[in-house]
Amino acid sequence: MANKPSPGELKNGLSEMQFYVTQHHGTEPPFTGRLLHNKKNGVYHCLVCDAPLFNSQTKYDSGCGWPSFYEPVSDEAIRYLTDNSHGMQRIEIRCGNCDAHLGHVFPDGPQPTGERYCVNSASLSFTDEQNGEQIKG
């Protein structure tokens, strides 16, 4: 995958939770993510490689405890993998650019797509379209 930092660079540049989530397919505890309640307009990026993933206009409150979106910025932004871990059948979502784990997608979202991209805050950064401020999850 393109633009992925070395394991050493990642270990030094990410918090313990960010590293666990993005590199070891972890999940942050629900309702704890820094970007869960973010209501600003802008773009959510991959924390590892800064690739754009989701527009704020597609974010909604699903009540699940993680930031939820109904569609990515492009078809290429997200990579999909079958995940049969923990006795469940799910679709894992990863960054299409660097392969960082983001979360999962479920078929219970709102229209127009009917999908819920359930994403760990720890795998995202957000860039505010008004002032360019970047917030890391």
Curated annotation (Swiss-Prot):
Which residues does the Swiss-Prot or TrEMBL record annotate as the active site?
A: C118 (nucleophile)
Named from the GO MF annotations, one term is: peptide-methionine (R)-S-oxide reductase activity
Reaction catalysed by this enzyme: L-methionyl-[protein] + [thioredoxin]-disulfide + H2O = L-methionyl-(R)-S-oxide-[protein] + [thioredoxin]-dithiol
Q: Which cofactor does it need?
A: Zn(2+)
> What biological processes does GO assign it?
protein repair; response to oxidative stress
Presence of the UniProt keyword Metal-binding in the record: yes
Which UniProt key words apply to this protein?
Metal-binding, Oxidoreductase, Zinc
Domain MsrB as annotated: residue spans: 7-129
EC class, as a word, reads: oxidoreductase
Pfam families named among the record's database cross-references: SelR
Sites binding Zn(2+) sit at C46, C49, C95, C98
> Could you tell me the EC number(s) of this protein?
1.8.4.12
Instruction: Explain how, and how many, cofactor molecules are bound.
Output: Binds 1 zinc ion per subunit. The zinc ion is important for the structural integrity of the protein.
One Gene Ontology cellular component = cytoplasm
Taxonomy, superkingdom? Bacteria
Name the family: Belongs to the MsrB Met sulfoxide reductase family.
Report what the protein is called: Peptide methionine sulfoxide reductase MsrB
